[in-house]
Amino acid sequence: MDKTQNSKSVNDMTVGSPLRAIIQFAIPLILGYILQQMYLIIDAAIVGRWIGVGALAAVGASSSIMFLIMGFCNGSCAGFAIPIAQAFGARDYAKMRTYVSNSIRIAVVFAVVITFLSCIFCGKILHLVNTPKEVFDDAYIFLMLQFAAIPFTIAYNLLSGQIRALGNSKQPFYFLITASVINIILDAILILGMGLGVEGAGIATWLSQGISVLLCIWFIQKKMQILIPKGEEKKFDNKKVSILLNNGVPMGLQFSITAIGLIMLQSANNALGTVYVAAFTASMRIKYLFTCVFENIGVAMATYCGQNLGARKLERIGQGVRAAIKMMVVYFVITFLLIYPFADEMMMLFVDKGEAEVVTYAAQFMRIANYFYPCLGLLTILRYSIQGLGYSNLSMLSGVMEMIARCGVSLWLVPALAWTGVCFGDPVAWVMADLFLIPAFLWLYKHLKKEVL
């Protein structure tokens, strides 16, 4: 038995109340994500109000591209953490560390290849999504700076994913606090003080991500040595690499496939003009702030299901899913009471009151999306639960459903309804994904229960 297994830095989610375990794990994730989105909101407010709506549009014009590439990186790293969580739940710590060492090898290769290809094709991608000419140069500069930070993004998501696989979501939250505060300070210095514009926003993000990586490394070395491979555990293991890729690549592709639909939707929206691009950017910032609770309840479910599958506690997995759905319903009611009456005021964070069109369109987007938040909540809970159970291919197929839905909206609804069609892009995608995920999860859960019995 590993002497470090009882460290206060780890959290066993296979015992105790499922609801309590999920809430305790999810709260730091939610707070961290809110903090991250608050930074993005402050960043967009600085760009939109002090540089101009055109600069805000430049940052927003590349958002779906960033989701395509960063989504693959983040999803892959999250997938690499699943076998680690399962091995931890099974108390097989040597196996867990072998997964850690081999996931690092894969991540290094991914970082080099993805960074190189992204930088090479940056300009062509912006043309592909119909980026408005008046904001193209700024969008190109901002995107290149984001691509330069890909190695840091992969490193942070890999290391924080390993920490969370052992049930510790607090430390990554503390690291995000530090990085976000530094990011905001750098924004103020580089954009307001030095007048660097969108370049300043990109540089600030680059530096803060590097700091978050260093903090993860420090914590693992000092407080979570159970993750550090020893001796034979450091060797390349073809079987372990195959398992890691089978979990990581489908999860990465799920995000990227979803992003293809978002790119199609954003491309259709970009063609409507700069006002609509700015409205889309502002509304997405607020949307992500509200939907992060759904997303991070889902992330908690991936670790929860992974650990409990390793411990062969299938009944406990079902209890956890039901508890998460109850949390989702309560949160939806809260969002409705905030968004429906105050959407317009929220949008004024990004643009002056004189930009009435931007405010009106962005508020419309928020209200329509809010009606369908229960669909999004169910989507994240079931998708991440399936991932935690080790069936990433099924969750990837739900991403395909989202992509098909958004492409359909882009090709037919947007030409017919213009901005209103854009507003229905997300809701239609969420409903389509749920139509696949609900029967998929029920089948998988029944199948696994038979295997355990």
Task: Give residue ranges: language-model regions.
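Transmembrane helical elements of multi-pass membrane transporters/channels
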Residues: Q24-D43, L145, Y156, A179, ...
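Interfacial/gating helices of multi-pass transporter permease domains
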Residues: V47-F67, K133-D138, V198-E199, K240-N247, ...
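Short alpha-helical transmembrane segments in multi-pass integral membrane proteins
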Residues: M1-A26, I84-A149, G193-V249, C305-F372, ...
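Residue-level signal for short hydrophobic patches within transmembrane helices
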Residues: V15, L19-M38, I42, I65-F72, ...
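Short runs within selected transmembrane alpha-helices of multi-pass transporters and secretion channels
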Residues: C77, L145-R164, P172-S180, A201-L214, ...
